[in-house]
């Protein structure tokens, strides 16, 4: 009985990981950084003609990883998607400034 439960547990874990990665299959996902800019990710369906670009951003206390399901869905629909982290959020190493009335 324990062996059957263990096998079912392993199968459930494998299925969960497969389902998490299924959304990325067939897409080109390229992290990049432009000089001193924020870290970003480019999502593109390979073999597609040049497509309209969609910039996916996050709200306060968010990250590009949080917005990844939107980026994946748009890339699957044929758009070229660029997603990035604002200062002080996600993997952007630059801290958020205290003065929110000026832009550096």
Q: Can you annotate each of these PLM segments?
A:
Residues 66-67, 92-96:
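Conserved catalytic-core motifs of eukaryotic protein kinase domains, centered on the activation segment
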Residues 60-73, 86:
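The serine-hydrolase catalytic nucleophile loop
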Residues 1-10:
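N-terminal Sec-pathway targeting helices
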Residues 75-94:
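Conserved alpha/beta-hydrolase
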Residues 66, 99-104:
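Alpha/beta-hydrolase active-site loop
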């Amino acid at each position: 009985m324990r062996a059957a439960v263990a096998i079912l547990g392993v199968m459930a874990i494998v299925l969960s990981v497969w389902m998490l990665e299924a959304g990325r299959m067939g897409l080109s996902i390229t992290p990049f950084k432009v000089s001193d800019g924020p870290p970003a990710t480019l999502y593109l369906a390979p073999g597609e003609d040049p497509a309209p670009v969609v910039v996916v951003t996050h709200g306060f206390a968010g990250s590009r990883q949080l917005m990844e399901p939107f980026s994946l869905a748009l890339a699957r629909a044929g758009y070229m998607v660029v997603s990035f982290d604002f200062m002080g959020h996600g993997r952007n190493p630059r801290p958020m400034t205290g003065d929110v009335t000026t832009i550096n």
